[in-house]
Regions:
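Extended beta-strand/beta-hairpin segments
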Residues: 1-13, 23-100
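Alpha-helical metal-binding/catalytic segments enriched in His/Glu/Asp
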Residues: 15-19
Length: 100
């Protein structure tokens, strides 16, 4: 059934949107003129012998505009350190659900 985005797609979408918003925000603050910004993320999850997962996320970002290499590197660096990316890279403690 087609019920919309999967939970994994929603997670990747959140990271992607954070990266795009960060690029737009930094460009505006620095006076860098940009056009359309797109981010495409993909992930591969591998199960370890103990049942845990190692997940690799790859990101491709396109920024339209006549940007210098320095500006492009700055914007992508900032995108790679956006809030949601930093949260996901951090250590998580996910407690078991409680019945209410």
């Amino acid at each position: 059934t087609d019920l919309g985005m999967s939970p994994t797609e929603l997670l990747l979408s959140g990271i992607s949107m954070c990266k795009v918003a960060t690029i737009r925000n930094v460009a505006r603050r620095k006076g860098i003129e940009i056009g359309e910004v797109n981010a495409h993320l993909s992930q591969i999850a591998k199960r370890n012998a103990d049942g845990t997962f190692i997940t690799t996320v790859d990101s491709e970002i396109s920024i339209e505009g006549n940007l210098s290499d320095e500006d492009r590197k700055l914007l992508i660096h900032e995108a790679d350190n956006c809030y949601v990316t930093r949260v996901v890279r951090g250590e998580w403690i996910i407690n078991d659900s409680k019945a209410i």
